[in-house]
């Protein structure tokens, strides 16, 4: 846990999933402090919109203003709810919207934590363009190293005149005034052909490897299991290309597409609808934190390309949580397949959780591993 003192309230904040006590990662950063400083002793007219509030630092601090927390991460929503409870703040003080929803009209203040990808930032700025006014105070923040010329140009292009502040604690702010500059329409998704198939893959703004098949997924697809039955999971599904291939290779199976990103799940659904509509009755789509809340002993197999970062931080906490949830939800003799960078040494992590692990395939960068849920372990 970490403590954030600001002009609104003193907060105790924790990351979600929680990090270990040996190398704890902080649940807020200097950019959060810097943004809140801009609103000290300031009357806030109209709705407050907060975008990409990773662990709820801004939402908790501004809870008395009934803010809207907008983002593309269910884990961030869970983190914010947990930190509201931790600080004795009514959860209903914050209204949660995902990035595909319509934003509230005529906000008084918009606070943006600049996301990792320009594509998501552009989608969010275009959504804001429909609701902000020239009186809306628009402030964005990030580590100074993460604000580039391209970031500023995007604010200018979509919203209007943009300036930056001096760096403070290695953070920098962007101030923007809306003046409705001319702007061409843009498609909601990017599409590309998947080589070796007749499929066209559609990706919303925040989907990993948005403009083509990433090399880890490409390697994984060469070693996917075939002729499985029952329910199998594409965990952390992204655009659903793994799950789509599983539907094709396992005609007797149902595939459950799971991701914490609403845009990823929307992309997966769109890709099944457009490429294998006949398989929709064998498909389920779920926005979730790994397999939290899913009944145990449900699935015959789980397939996963786990992330090794959360927001801007390198961490295996999300992957570790995925592995534990996968084991709980697998049937006895159910199988977990993963692809990962070789240097992450997930072989020993899986062996610790499952009691076994087998290398299915390897190259100079990636490894495909399989672990089986055995009846003798609980």
Swiss-Prot record:
A GO molecular function held by the record: nucleic acid binding
SUPFAM superfamilies: S-adenosyl-L-methionine-dependent methyltransferases
First-level EC class: transferase
EC number per UniProt: 2.1.1.174
Main location group: cytoplasm
UniProt catalytic activity: guanosine(1835) in 23S rRNA + S-adenosyl-L-methionine = N(2)-methylguanosine(1835) in 23S rRNA + S-adenosyl-L-homocysteine + H(+)
Keywords from the named record: Cytoplasm, Methyltransferase, rRNA processing, S-adenosyl-L-methionine, Transferase
Subcellular location: Cytoplasm
GO annotation, cellular component aspect: cytoplasm
Top-level taxon: Bacteria
Keyword rRNA processing set for record: yes
Transferase among keywords: yes
Family from the record: Belongs to the methyltransferase superfamily. RlmG family.
Function: Specifically methylates the guanine in position 1835 (m2G1835) of 23S rRNA.
Name used for this protein in its record: Ribosomal RNA large subunit methyltransferase G
Organism ancestry: Bacteria, Pseudomonadati, Pseudomonadota, Gammaproteobacteria, Enterobacterales
